[in-house]
């Protein structure tokens, strides 16, 4: 009895397993198409795409694939190990789970043609020829490794004979690679991307030295040594022949067949060299490419996969045009969700880029090249993924070099070259919602959400190098119902990266950095930009958000445009006139920062709410920055003070060289309520001015000008070292406000008065913040100031800290 029950339970479990995980996932389609497999996306995708079908559908090409003999000792590919293998035809093979197999590419010369490779176990490709296939699918848990190139083909390619009459792929994934969870690693053994400098019109010096390419001894198979040169004028590159010196460091260039050979220009700021190996050469190929240009291929990675690409040229891939999307539509039966009754083939599939990566947090791209010669959207698209990309070349004809969509928390980009041939102005006329969230308008890196760390990258030809665009409603194309703007702080680190917006893209405004929330007022975000160095404009449209720049280096031509709720500039140097006059803010904080001004006639910032801290250190000569720096100023925050008080105002400087003397440095103090006062810098490198507050209420706009006074009898600010506007000092005569004082005697009155002024004990607590009035934050600067109160104030007090 118990045995019978157990058998029934086991059969029930088996039935449920097959019902839930096998049959239900197979979607039947109309005649002429592959059936489809429904692949459940990870939860993060459904989080961003909540209202529409979030499942992924791919053709059921693995069902009838040949499986190897069930012998564990078989670990190398041979046709005899796959029953039914057709030596003269197109074969699909399946590597089962817990099986590992090595495929050596000389089999390509032995009438072995692979059509589909399905990998649930491990499939390793070695050799010195291309892996020749139409489709590679890495199933969940599978592992694909290759140390040679991959050549995709389809029925449209010449030389592909007796192609079988196969069903159509409605999803548009193939020819190409589809990784559904597992790992993929494709690694070339030699570097293919090199930096170069010009020697003369036909010679360049590259780094590191290029290895000699072996030339076939067979004259019928002889291939010229070719390289492809990329510059600002030729962002898509041009082919030429080359010869090297003994160490492979100096390349002498010459024309190749009908390809023109333009001389290397003296004006080229960037020269990149791509060493491409093809299938006729006897060296190991380093391309992943579609064989001919009639149709393209793509690589689509999802499902939490691990991806590693090194020294690989992605060629003739990517077919998502820089036009409005037109995806394939599946018409499901109203009675059965596993039956598709009709398929409307799309003309512009989303995310069929050279490389599209989704829901994968461990992606590394190193020393690779991506070149898309057609008007495509982008070679690289990332969704909900973390990516490291370095020492690579990304060249596009249009669109953006990289598109980073929702959930991409981190992009680490270092020493890459991002080249764009032109901004496709035609795409600007297309309805905005069909394009703007997908980077159609000429960007280096177009980002919806990630933190970006860029170090030593070079951008050329774009309208905007870094473009953050947050859209309140972007469900039109990416199926995301909610705003792409999140409330988490976003950090952008841009260090030693350069931007060259070439003149070929017309008179459009060009920005090194653009951050735009598109009027989104529902969520506030705090942006941090670190180490940015540029001589180009940046633009911000952050109506309800704040942005802070740390260690900003703004060269000549730098400026800020747009509007932002709060702007912080901290520890920065801006070497351009009027660089921040065109930015509209509610609150501005400029702290420990130096701003160039050719004239000493500097207008202070106006229309700032109390709480803004604007203390730029203006300078007129960049040499001053190498000699002196401002160590501290007091007061260093806005203060409110009682008329009749006396306190010291100070500036402390620091020399940056032992040869610099402070003997002739003077400080000229001016304000609306005191006479001009000259104070010599003392032995402590400080200027101290005792300031007696008059009875006149209102703002006391205090300025100090540091001058190199070589003639003490004639002090002038014409050739100033630094000009500093102190934070706002507000003088009150008769006013009732919270004092910020606490009484030593707890029994003392809660309100004190002197000279007609009334003060309430303590401070006003608003949202855990201590304020001395309804619109001004309590400032700890008082504890740093030496203040003498009016003589009629007798009560013993101490400052709150």
Swiss-Prot record:
Signal peptide stretch: 1-22
UniProt-listed PANTHER family: GROWTH-DIFFERENTIATION TRANSITION PROTEIN 5-RELATED
The keyword Signal is annotated on this UniProt entry: yes
A Gene Ontology biological process term: regulation of developmental process
Protein name per UniProt: Growth-differentiation transition protein 7
Similarity field: Belongs to the GDT family.
Organism of derivation: Dictyostelium discoideum
Keywords from the UniProt entry: Secreted, Signal
Domain of life: Eukaryota
Compartments where located: Secreted
InterPro entries cross-referenced by the UniProt entry: GDT_regulator, STKINASEGDT
